[in-house]
Amino acid sequence: MKRKYRRLFVVIITLSIFAGSVVFVLGKLKNNVSFFYTPTELLSSSLINRPNIRIGGMVVKGTVQKYDDSIVFHITDLKNYIKVVYKGILPPLFSEGSWIVAKGKMVNGKFIASEILAKHDENYMPNKYKTNNL
């Protein structure tokens, strides 16, 4: 009988450790389920104080201002907008009206971006096919 109880004890301990690990991992991943937050989600949550946030939205037309050391623009989710300040080289697909994802943090009501990713639509067509009416 001792062997049977010892085996049962080992199985219970193993399952407990496994279940605890699953709960721990899911708890840590809970805040990282979304690749980015919209301006509305960011402004209406406690995420504003986090150091590394990704926000996504459309670059508002007429708001892009280029300076010697930075670029300032607004992004929107068509409900709210956030002012973004970025120091660095912009991706080639960045333009007014395009969708972007910016990584950074909120400081005094402005989003200070450390990285900009430009999004493109899924309907990519190489130039040689655009001219052939395909």
Curated annotation (Swiss-Prot):
Disulfide bonds: none annotated. Keywords: Cell inner membrane, Cell membrane, Cytochrome c-type biogenesis, Heme, Iron, Membrane, Metal-binding, Signal-anchor, Transmembrane, Transmembrane helix. Its main location: membrane. The keyword Membrane applies. Residues 1-7 are cytoplasmic. Gene3D superfamilies: Nucleic acid-binding proteins. GO terms for cellular component: plasma membrane. It comes from the Bacteria. Residues 29-134 are periplasmic. One of its GO terms (biological process) is cytochrome complex assembly. The keyword Amino-acid biosynthesis does not apply. Pfam families: CcmE. It is a single-pass type II membrane protein. One of its GO terms (molecular function) is heme binding. SUPFAM superfamilies: Heme chaperone CcmE. InterPro entries: CcmE, CcmE-like_sf, NA-bd_OB-fold. It is found in: Cell inner membrane. Heme binds at residues 120, 124. The chain crosses the membrane at residues 8-28. Heme chaperone required for the biogenesis of c-type cytochromes. Transiently binds heme delivered by CcmC and transfers the heme to apo-cytochromes in a process facilitated by CcmF and CcmH. NCBIfam families: PRK13254.1-1. This is Cytochrome c-type biogenesis protein CcmE. It comes from Ehrlichia ruminantium (strain Gardel).
